[in-house]
Design a protein with these regions (language model features):
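Short acidic (Asp/Glu) and glycine-rich catalytic loops that position anionic groups and cofactors
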Residues: 6, 32-36, 117-121
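Amphipathic, alpha-helical segments enriched in basic
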Residues: 24-27, 31, 113, 117
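Substrate-positioning beta->alpha
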Residues: 13-28, 48-55
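Glycine-rich phosphate/pyrophosphate-binding loop
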Residues: 92-145
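Mid/C-terminal beta-alpha module of Rossmann-like enzyme folds, strongest
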Residues: 33-98, 105, 140-144, 149-154
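Single conserved hydrophobic/aromatic residue that forms the stacking wall/gate
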Residues: 1-12
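Hydrophobic alpha-helical scaffolding
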Residues: 13-17, 42, 128-131
Length: 155
C-alpha cells in the first residue's frame, strides 16, 4: 500500500501537481503549437503536501500522523515555473504559457537606452500564485492515478 500500516508519519513540503497524462498533453500541445526554441509551461495547480497528506489519509481511511519538517538548507520556499522576464514575452494560451525563444543580441548598450520597466511590474508564475488545490480537488486528482485506483481496489 502507498500508506503502509507500519508507516509512522508523513513528511511534507509544497509542490506543483501534474499527472503523467497532463505531462503527455503538455508535450503534444507543444508539438502542435510550438515554434523552434519555444518553451511551454502548463498552468498546473499547486498544493501543499499537507493537502496531499490529508487527501491520502482520507482516501485510505488512515490516521497516519503528519510531520511538517520545514525547509531544508538550500531549498526554495516555492517553485517558480516562469520568471517575470519570461512572463513579459509569454503568450497566454489558456492552459499553457508559450515563452518564445529569446533571440535578442547581447548589445547591452541598447538595453540601457531602450530598456523596459514592464518587467519590474510583472510577477513570476510560481506555486504561491497559481490555483491551490483543496483536499477534495486533490482526492479527485489522486483518483486519476492508476497506482492509487489499484491500491484502493477501484479498477
Amino acid at each position: 500500500h502507498l500508506l503502509s500500516r507500519r508507516q509512522r508519519q508523513m513528511c511534507i513540503r509544497d509542490r506543483f501537481m501534474m499527472t503523467l497524462d497532463d505531462a503527455v498533453d503538455l508535450v503534444v500541445y507543444a508539438f502542435e503549437h510550438g515554434r523552434n526554441g519555444d518553451l511551454f509551461v502548463q498552468k498546473a495547480p499547486a498544493a501543499t503536501l499537507v493537502t496531499l497528506a490529508t487527501a491520502l489519509k482520507e482516501l485510505y481511511g488512515k490516521d497516519t500522523p503528519v510531520k511538517i519538517i520545514g525547509t531544508r538548507h538550500g531549498e526554495k520556499l516555492y517553485e517558480t515555473l516562469v520568471t517575470r522576464e519570461e512572463m513579459a514575452r509569454a503568450e497566454d494560451m489558456d492552459n499553457y504559457y508559450r515563452i518564445p525563444c529569446d533571440s535578442r543580441d547581447l548589445n547591452y548598450d541598447k538595453f540601457f537606452v531602450e530598456g523596459s520597466e514592464v518587467v519590474s511590474q510583472i510577477e513570476d508564475y510560481h506555486s504561491h500564485n497559481t490555483h491551490r488545490l483543496d483536499v477534495e480537488e486533490m482526492k479527485q486528482l489522486l483518483l486519476k492515478l492508476d497506482i492509487v485506483r489499484e491500491d484502493l481496489n477501484l479498477n
